[in-house]
A protein has these predicted regions:
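C-terminal capping/gating helix-and-loop segments adjacent to ligand/active sites or protein-protein/ligand interfaces
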Residues: 405-461
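Hinge/lid segment of periplasmic solute-binding proteins
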Residues: 50, 55-56, 120-177, 231, ...
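Extracytoplasmic/periplasmic solute-binding protein
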Residues: 156-162, 167, 197-253, 299
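Extracytoplasmic/periplasmic substrate-recognition and gating elements
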Residues: 110, 315-383
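Glycine-centered hinge/linker elements that transmit conformational signals in sensory
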Residues: 203-204, 248-284
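Short, polar/charged alpha-helical segment
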Residues: 54, 69-89, 434
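Short, solvent-exposed loop/beta-turn-alpha elements that line the ligand-binding surface or hinge
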Residues: 136-149, 191-192, 223, 241-266, ...
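Extracytoplasmic "Venus flytrap"/periplasmic binding protein-like
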Residues: 81-146, 158-159, 174-186, 293, ...
């Protein structure tokens, strides 16, 4: 009973709170460094850094429309600190999950439009390239390690990735160890899971032994409300797209064939069958529900990514509790597959803003990726792996968490990372169509043929609409 009460309190806290702000992380860093410099030295360094930031900040203002709700508090704290140091107003607004494109359209129509926004890749850039300032020649572009992390239109640099992320099936190490110690366990270690067939056998067995293991299900709820459905209509849907592209040697298409949709079906069936909740409840289940279920030990597996680290460790889970598996769908050769790694987060500066606001926005971005405070916040508070040179100058600015380590481990083992092909999805309307069909299939009000139709026919329709065909 005590365990259940504590767990309930943790889950409530998780839903009610977000990530720890940058101020707390800065305080920890100051404490850690206390043995190497005096308080006066630290204060002097901070004052000098503030003076430098103020000198370069410009006379405009910054309005950042943030894409990531899970980092909203951290961005607010970082913006407030920059304003304190420079006097430059930095406003951070965060779009609700799943609404970024609509929110951006609305905000761009206002007289006080965002000076800093983001696109998800080349498809997103196509909609907004007329708003994008050329970032070539800026201090931000000088910090990028490779043009692999930028979006170009001709020679113009119109977007710069600010985080490289990885997703897969996060698992609770301790629960897996407890399962593996049970009589008749399918595997002796999570390391033996290297295919869909093995994953399904393990998940089915955990589901059958859930009471003995003390969980509600093998997988967290596959919630299909707007705070969670992107995990399945976008991130999970990436797998059949990736394998089709891989077979054809392409990076985009005007007409997806759906070669691997049967594989998509079997992983989706596994998620919604070996679950913490009844399929009929999925339409109302949220991202917070899934995170809380995992953090409280109600499920062994949780599809999400490195960005979820702060949420699931905020209330009890430790680094030792976390591992990550590839998302196996039964594709040929998947035993050599790694995790899904890429970016859909590219900063763009609004070229229609005033020159003063543009320069202040560029100065803010330079400070974010080069200052001690900015780097600490991105790497350690937000948990980002970034493509910027300044983060390589000190190991403390390299994000260290077991989910990132898992990704590095698969690469070191020679596994092939799964590319983020979902950035080629033709539109948000296409994603929503697939999401609706998945939901109806899960709750028994639709069939899988409707998913295929939304996936294949919907792709052709939306691609043609997006490209004026």
């Amino acid at each position: 009973m005590k365990k259940k009460i504590v767990c309930a309190m943790m889950c409530v806290a998780m839903v009610a709170t977000s990530l720890v702000g940058c101020g707390s992380k800065a305080d920890d860093t100051a404490t850690d460094n206390a043995g190497t410099e005096t308080t006066d030295d630290a204060a002097g360094d901070d004052a000098a850094a503030a003076d430098d930031a103020a000198a370069n900040a410009g006379s405009g203002k910054v309005y950042y429309l943030n894409f990531k709700p899970e980092q909203a508090e951290a961005w607010q704290d970082l913006a407030a600190s920059y304003t304190d140091q420079t006097g430059v107003e930095v406003v951070v607004e965060t779009a609700a999950s799943g609404t970024y494109e609509d929110t951006l359209k609305s905000e761009m129509a206002k007289s006080e439009a965002p000076t800093l926004f983001q696109v998800n890749g080349h498809v997103g850039l196509a909609n907004w390239k007329d708003y994008c300032y050329d970032l070539s020649g800026t201090a931000l572009y000088d910090q990028v390690k490779s043009d692999d992390f930028v979006l170009k239109d001709g020679d113009a640099v119109q977007g710069i990735a600010y985080v490289i992320e990885t997703y897969g099936i996060i698992y609770n190490v301790k629960l897996m160890q407890e399962y593996c110690a049970m009589d008749g366990a399918v595997v002796a270690s999570a390391d033996e899971i290297n295919s869909f067939d093995t994953l399904k056998a393990v998940a089915d067995d955990i589901q059958a032994k859930k009471d003995e293991l003390g969980v509600l299900g093998a997988f967290t709820s596959a919630g299909m409300d707007s705070s969670s459905d992107w995990r399945f209509k976008t991130h999970l849907a990436n797998l059949p797209i990736y394998y089709e592209y891989k077979d054809k040697g392409i990076g985009s298409t005007d007409a997806i064939e759906g070669t691997y949709l049967d594989n998509y079906k079997q992983i989706w069936d596994l998620y919604i069958t070996d679950s913490t909740c009844d399929k009929a409840l999925l339409s109302s289940k949220t991202g917070e529900d899934a995170a809380a279920e995992f953090a409280c030990g109600d499920a062994v597996f949780y599809q999400n990514g490195t960005w979820a680290y702060g949420d699931i460790t905020a209330d009890g889970l430790t680094d030792d509790d976390l591992g990550m598996l590839p998302i196996y769908i039964g594709a040929p050769g998947e035993e050599n597959q790694g995790l899904c790694t890429g970016s859909e987060n590219y900063w763009c500066v609004n070229k229609n803003a005033s020159e003063e606001d543009i320069q202040s926005t560029l100065a803010f971005l330079e400070w974010v990726v080069t200052s001690d405070e900015g780097r600490d916040c991105l790497a350690n508070t937000m948990g980002f792996t970034t493509p910027f040179k300044a983060f390589d100058e000190d190991v403390k600015y390299k994000a260290q968490n077991p989910l990132i380590s898992a990704a590095d481990g698969y690469v070191a083992a020679g596994k092939t990372s799964v590319a983020w092909c979902f950035t080629s999805m033709p539109s948000e309307t296409w994603k929503n169509g697939v999401g609706s069909a998945l939901t109806e299939y899960a709750q028994g009000t639709g069939d899988w043929d409707a998913v295929k139709t939304a996936f294949v026919d919907g792709w052709a329709t939306e691609y043609a609409a997006a490209n004026g065909q």
